[in-house]
A protein has these predicted regions:
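Short, well-ordered alpha-helical segments in soluble proteins
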Residues: 89, 93, 176-177, 203, ...
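Cysteine-dependent hydrolase recognition
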Residues: 151, 155-158, 298
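Cysteine-dependent deubiquitinase/ubiquitin-like isopeptidase catalytic cores across multiple families
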Residues: 159, 167-202
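Active-site signature of cysteine proteases
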Residues: 189, 193-197, 201-204, 212-298
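Short coil/turn segments at beta-strand junctions that form active-site/ligand-binding loops
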Residues: 207
Length: 298
């Protein structure tokens, strides 16, 4: 009986969803990315998105401040962690988006994160003047939040107070050469470890990966459903360099952008398996419960 209780305590929603998702092999994903996405063509397209850590609170929290086009990359409210992660993801592959955040220069063509004329009018009417990088980053989050809330369940919208569901985040996520799909993660299983290995393979290939985090179903359903979104960053970016790569030298690791505090953390891949305690890189949640894995765009 004790073993049953223990299993229930660490059950996560991904355990219930994982039979619905196809298996993932990290080696297969790495080969497909290397062959079909051609990461080398992305070289030089990754913008300068991180500055060296300087704030005392960032050092105390063990992270490095993340910046995008001069804006501190912090989610604008309690429901926009997914929006901030998706803007950061898009900026990693789009220098024109970074330039707009930095100085307001309009991209040559429309971007899903940049408000159109009507959107700018609405922002001004609500008191948000796009006068500096921080406000433009906030505005981009608002635009993305609106997009991910539309048509979430057929034609029905998603309540904005409930954040960003994984399937609309996968629909909205954009990075050159790939699209994204939802892969549930149970970090106590070989299948979950394979998904996390696939995340590592993607970041090694230069592709960022959004991660959904949460707690244990044993503490109640509200702790097990996806509660927060972070972003595994491409290895070799300035975010990665500024972090110092401090986790277990030589061991596979991820550099994770955590939007609630706007910090990046380096985490050993092994430390994401069979977790029982909160982790700052996961927004102080204990588990990765889903990943938006990249696949070569059709």
């Amino acid at each position: 009986m004790a073993s049953i209780r223990e299993s229930w305590r660490y059950l996560t929603l991904s355990t219930l969803l994982s039979p619905l998702a196809p298996p993932t092999r990290a080696g297969d994903l790495a080969r497909r990315l290397a062959t079909d996405v051609l990461p080398e063509r992305l070289a030089g397209r990754l913008p300068d998105t991180a500055h060296a850590a300087s704030a005392h609170d960032a050092r105390a929290l063990g992270g490095t401040p993340a910046r995008i086009g001069g804006a501190r990359a912090v989610q604008r409210d309690a429901t926009t962690c997914g929006s901030a992660a998706l803007v950061h993801l898009a900026a990693l592959g789009d220098p024109e988006l970074v330039r707009w955040i930095e100085d307001g220069t309009a991209p040559a063509s429309p971007r899903p994160e940049v408000p159109d004329v009507a959107g700018r009018v609405d922002l001004v009417a609500s008191g948000m003047e796009l006068t500096d990088p921080d406000r433009r980053f906030d505005a981009a989050q608002r635009v993305v939040k609106s997009a991910t809330s539309r048509r979430a369940i057929g034609p029905v919208g998603w309540p904005e107070g409930l954040g960003t569901p994984p399937w609309t985040a996968a629909r909205q996520a954009r990075f050159p050469g790939v699209s994204y799909r939802v892969a549930p993660v149970d970090d106590r299983t070989a299948r979950g470890a394979a998904v996390l290995a696939a995340v590592h393979a993607a970041t090694t290939a230069g592709i960022p990966v959004p991660l959904y985090t949460s707690g244990d179903l044993g503490r109640g359903l509200r702790f097990a459903v996806p509660r927060h979104v972070v972003l595994a960053l491409p290895q070799g970016t300035d975010d990665d360099a500024a972090s110092g790569r401090s986790a277990r030298p030589g061991a596979p690791s991820l550099t994770i952008y955590e939007p609630s505090r706007g910090l990046t953390h380096v985490v050993a891949l092994a430390d994401l398996l069979a977790r029982t305690s909160p982790l700052k890189a996961l927004g102080s949640w204990s588990h990765v419960v889903a990943a938006l894995l990249p696949r070569p765009a059709a």
